[in-house]
Regions:
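Alpha/beta enzyme core
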Residues: 2-8, 12-267, 271-292, 298-300, ...
């Protein structure tokens, strides 16, 4: 069930937020069932769409999990949304793990997928498996996402052989932004389509638990989804994928630039936060916060004793 965007009708943003379906209410339809990689395949076979949202901290992850989302992705997009980097290339394994641990503590039902950041699997297979193991042992990740197509197939097999599930990621791969010459839609000509199909089939044969597809024409994404056994999760890849993912901050308008074409805003948390902070500041500056009711008080006996002590001190100074 789609959560409605903030209403423009009477009442403030806070009232609009509070009027949404309560957490754990009707739009949570998993009934507390833990999502696994097997669950994703069941959903694909039953043509039941899979939902995935990024989360990078305990509070956000807990809310997303309680809303019934099947996959929580700790994406390397946290480099931009949480750490203020220009792109995803700068974030480190240790920085990623810091956030993966926080999200792990919040989740009860959703499947935790974590991005392996740029440089953590590019040097050699031994280092890649070692880094992947850290994400599982230290971070509690259940699936690791690796960008790249058929050239990553052997590496993915090695990581899977280490008993670590892997999610593939093809199409527009942000870690390859410098090679691609920017964030450009992929697979717009026959050669590009053929390469995407080879990438998808190679990763499917390697045994990926699911396949993220980013920034490609919907027709191509539909072809891939029909050809592979792995569930496909699209972002900017049209409605034919088995599931969809959006960045938490995009969903809630917590970004500071124009959104991508595929982004749909489902709320305006930026406006709510701005209003709340401005209201707090105004109340403090006008001496309306904190009120007497929001303050702690001494017990009557202690207050009386303190007044006696203070009166004695004042008398001594006279």
């Amino acid at each position: 069930m789609r959560v409605q965007a903030l209403s423009a009708k009477g009442g403030g943003a806070l009232e609009d937020i509070m009027s949404l379906t309560p957490i754990g209410g009707p739009f949570s339809d998993r009934s507390g069932r833990k999502v696994t990689t097997a669950t994703l395949r069941e959903l694909k076979l039953s043509h039941s769409p899979i939902t995935c949202i990024t989360a990078y901290d305990y509070a956000a992850a807990r809310l997303v999990d309680q809303a019934g989302v099947e996959i929580v992705l700790v994406g390397d997009s946290l480099a931009q949304t949480m750490l203020g980097y220009e792109n995803t290339l700068s974030v480190t394994v240790d920085e990623m793990l810091h956030h993966v641990k926080a999200v792990r503590r919040a989740l009860k039902n959703a499947l935790l997928v974590a991005d392996m950041p740029f440089g953590s699997y590019h040097i050699d297979t031994k280092d890649a498996v070692a880094n992947a193991t850290r994400f599982v042992k230290e971070g509690g990740a259940e699936v690791l996402k690796i960008e790249g197509g058929e050239k990553r197939a052997d590496l993915i097999r090695h990581i899977i052989d280490a008993e670590i599930p892997v999610a593939g990621h093809i199409g527009l791969t942000p870690q390859s932004v410098n090679v691609m010459g920017g964030y450009k839609v992929q697979g717009k000509n026959l050669g590009g389509i053929e390469q995407l199909m080879r990438d998808a089939l190679a990763l499917d044969h390697a045994g990926v638990a699911c396949l993220f597809i980013e920034g490609i024409p919907r027709e191509v994404a539909g072809m891939i989804t029909a050809e592979v056994s792995a569930p496909t999760i699209g972002i900017g890849a049209g409605p034919e994928c088995d599931g969809q993912v959006l960045v938490f901050h995009d969903v809630l308008n917590l970004t500071f630039g124009p959104p991508a074409k595929f982004v749909r805003r489902y709320g305006d948390a930026a406006a709510l936060i701005s209003q709340a902070v401005q209201a707090f500041r105004a109340d403090v500056r006008s001496h309306q916060y904190p009120s007497d009711e929001e303050s702690y008080h001494l017990p009557k006996e202690t207050k009386a004793a303190l007044e006696t002590v203070l009166e004695r001190k004042r008398a001594m100074r006279r």
